[in-house]
Amino acid sequence: MNRTQLLTLIATGLGLFMIFLDALIVNVALPDIQRSFAVGEDGLQWVVASYSLGMAVFIMSAATLADLDGRRRWYLIGVSLFTLGSIACGLAPSIAVLTTARGAQGLGAAAVSVTSLALVSAAFPEAKEKARAIGIWTAIASIGTTTGPTLGGLLVDQWGWRSIFYVNLPMGALVLFLTLCYVEESCNERARRFDLSGQLLFIVAVGALVYAVIEGPQIGWTSVQTIVMLWTAAVGCALFVWLERRSSNPMMDLTLFRDTSYALAIATICTVFFAVYGMLLLTTQFLQNVRGYTPSVTGLMILPFSAAVAIVSPLVGHLVGRIGARVPILAGLCMLMLGLLMLIFSEHRSSALVLVGLGLCGSGVALCLTPITTVAMTAVPAERAGMASGIMSAQRAIGSTIGFAVLGSVLAAWLSATLEPHLERAVPDPVQRHVLAEIIIDSANPRAHVGGIVPRRHIEHRDPVAIAEEDFIEGIRVALLVATATLAVVFLAGWRWFPRDVHTAGSDLSERLPTAMTVECAVSHMPGATWCRLWPA
């Protein structure tokens, strides 16, 4: 490994480290962000969902543009946009600016994630050096995701929530300097054309759906605004499918979904990310707003999830090679559902059960991600493997975005339906009760301003804080049950339709690909996990 190769590896690894760090670091800062801007559950959902939404809508087009215009160029664009977005997040004077800046971060992260590994692959043409470099690159990125919640908690406790964004500035500047000075350009002369119409329709469909799901509990599911957004999403999706089926250079090749194994693998991976990222959002809020933990302690409490993913992931590839993909997928889904059920029934008990539940969730995720990728990539022709991999990347981001939106909205809807009637046991005055319920729901905090709204002498029988905490716990339980139910549906479908004869480990997929393609091990958007990404040589 010469000096240029080493610095290329550092530049690409640090870029990926930044975007993976921000995938989870924001969660522990949400209560502080809420207090700064006085926003409700929907505002917090937008803060976390806008990042993954930006990635979801742009990741496939970013790969095409990078192949056409140069991967180094788009890596620089991605890092620059991500860094500028971080500055805007840190300086944000309102929740609207913060949400917009998070979306810009997501767009930059999409460009970084699809170009980083390609630049490493081009810098190390020799097979053994390439494998070693990718191992180091993967480790650097994994550190970002496994340490994100813990580092975020420490930063928030010491310097406030804005510091979690400012920490990206020196790293971004270093990555830009190293990339400009040492990273060589590469591109793909056979890349397909950029599908602008498909990209715009994809943004409209996904964006309208996420907006309707997040805002529905606040503005009403039958309101004109919600109905218009749902119809916009439906029409946008229909037009997108119609256009992509007729395009000679589609952004998303929908004919791949004719294969049952591939379609089921995509549905499974989307559902896993839906459940896990929604769970992480709700668990973080529970630990801080109900248990009263500080951000740093909350970050440490989340660590078993990330650690389990990091520990189990490297072992799964060998397991798939020996026993096939079907058993690890189904076992991983079972373990993930068991972890969610443990979280559902652990709120009133010891923190140890929460830690065990998070560890089971992490182990289940790690156990099923690699074999799902194996099933998907062995189900498609070799010449379409790049497109198949790109669709998987987009569906991961879409799953996490919808998870934030749906599970957060389930909690908000539960509180809207139950909190005010339950508060009648403690606050008999209907005006005070209504105002208190609205403030608790809007602040997403069961302890919010109780003393300032209801004087102690007006409280009867029950403590309103205790009632609100019980409703929050029940709302989180309902949301996690929704996540568990979606996983159960996918499990039953997998039991019926996942193939029984897929024994090809991710590292062996190169045997079935033409020499024009190289198969590399990339880090997914899940902490510590690895998956297969295919790059044109």
Curated annotation (Swiss-Prot):
Protein's name in the database: Multidrug resistance protein Stp
Localization terms from the record: Cell membrane
Record-stated family: Belongs to the major facilitator superfamily. EmrB family.
Keyword Transmembrane: yes
Functional description taken from the UniProt entry: Contributes to spectinomycin and tetracycline resistance.
A GO biological-process term: response to antibiotic
KW Aminoacyl-tRNA synthetase (keyword) present: no
Record keywords: Antibiotic resistance, Cell membrane, Membrane, Transmembrane, Transmembrane helix, Transport
Single GO molecular function: transmembrane transporter activity
InterPro entries (UniProt xref): EmrB-like (IPR004638), MFS (IPR011701), MFS_dom (IPR020846), MFS_trans_sf (IPR036259)
Spans through the membrane: 6-26, 46-66, 77-97, 104-124, 136-156, 163-183, 200-220, 223-243, 262-282, 300-320, 327-347, 352-372, 397-417, 478-498
Main location class: membrane
Membrane topology: Multi-pass membrane protein
NCBIfam families registered for this protein in UniProt: efflux_EmrB
Single GO cellular component term: plasma membrane
